[in-house]
Design a protein with these regions (language model features):
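Hydrophobic alpha-helical segments, chiefly the membrane-spanning helices
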Residues: 1-336
Length: 336
């Protein structure tokens, strides 16, 4: 047991270092490409940091264990647990990171049009994914149509986000790199090749650290006797969402609210469209009580964020309230 906790601590350090390497390179990439913070956060950062939680269900469905039922439980739990974590606990932690400097009545001010686009897309997509749970397994044509609609939503979202980039850059929302690139400190020039190299190093460390953390968490959960579905819904996302949590905390502390929130909401869109599409087609995708409870809380938390998307920003006290959603889910699920 002691070794497991040492492994968890070491992998957490790896993830923290990786997040610094990744965010630093991404800021330089966004600045060099002259793209908005919305594109950098909601697309590039979101997809990059979503790699660990994307791998978990894919590897599970490809045959992570010898039991197909267990593989499907892990797959469904990981797919639905990630957006739950982002909409509740991750948002709460980001707000908590600046409550001392901004106060509970302070605000976090991401660029509003991009934030609203992210939340509207996620709410539409996750609602479709929820509807798919009630479609009988034998009605594969309807399930396939819903899965295709989810993929189409993400494609449309990417197109709209890129289209808005030029206007946002002109309006002062371009990505800026406040610090020198880390690789430049060891004598390498700051150019596109070294930026991409540092990005790849950051992603590799993020994925490796998250996988190691997942391994440690799984070991602890087995010792405690936690089920596969509960493990993938509650415990694994704590590890796989660490890159988003750490990146967003780093950016929010630097005053980069659009990047910080875009990293979360962009990951929610990615994980609320493409991954559920896979789940609909490759798993039972049924409205089991613990699954449906998580989906309802996720939609409620996302709707709460959307309702609070005001011109002057989102109140920190309102974001702290999202943490109650995660606490409520734990209480309801563990009480069963």
């Amino acid at each position: 047991m002691t070794f497991m906790f040492v492994e968890l601590a070491f992998m957490l350090i790896v993830i923290l270092v990786a997040a610094e390497v990744f965010t630093n390179a991404l800021e330089h990439l966004g600045e060099r490409l002259k793209i908005s913070e919305g594109v950098t956060g909601s697309l590039f950062a979101a997809v990059g940091t979503a790699l660990p939680e994307t791998m978990v269900p894919l590897l599970a469905l490809a045959g992570g264990t010898s039991s197909q039922a267990v593989n499907e439980e892990i797959g469904v739990g990981a797919i639905l647990g990630a957006p739950l974590m982002l909409a509740t606990l991750t948002t709460f932690l980001m707000a908590l990171a600046v409550i001392r400097s901004r106060g509970p009545r302070g605000t976090i001010t991401p660029e509003r049009t991009g934030f609203v686009r992210d939340m509207n897309t996620f709410l539409a997509a996750f609602s479709l994914a929820t509807v798919a749970m009630f479609v009988p397994h034998h009605n594969w044509a309807v399930r396939a149509l819903l899965a295709a609609m989810l993929v189409g939503l993400y494609v449309m979202y990417v197109v709209l986000t890129f289209r808005a980039s030029t206007r946002l850059v002109d309006a002062g929302h371009g990505t800026e790199a406040p610090h020198a690139m880390l690789l430049s400190r060891v004598g390498l020039p700051t150019n596109l090749a070294t930026i991409v190299l540092q990005l790849l190093i950051g992603v590799a460390l993020l994925v490796g650290g998250a996988k190691g953390f997942i391994h440690g968490v799984e070991g602890v959960s087995h010792v405690l006797g936690v089920s596969a579905l509960l493990l993938s819904l509650i415990i694994v996302p704590i590890a796989t969402e660490l890159p988003e949590k750490v990146n967003s905390v780093l950016w929010i502390r630097r005053g980069k609210d659009t990047l910080a929130f875009g990293n979360i909401t962009g990951a929610m869109v990615f994980q609320g469209t493409l991954l559920p599409a896979i789940g609909i087609m490759l798993t039972p995708w049924e409205p089991r009580p613990e699954v449906l409870t998580g989906v309802i809380i996720t939609l409620a938390a996302a709707a709460w964020l959307r309702v609070n998307a005001r011109t002057r920003g989102l109140a920190i006290w309102a974001l702290l309230a999202n943490g109650a959603g995660y606490a409520g889910y734990l209480a309801v699920t563990l009480a069963r």
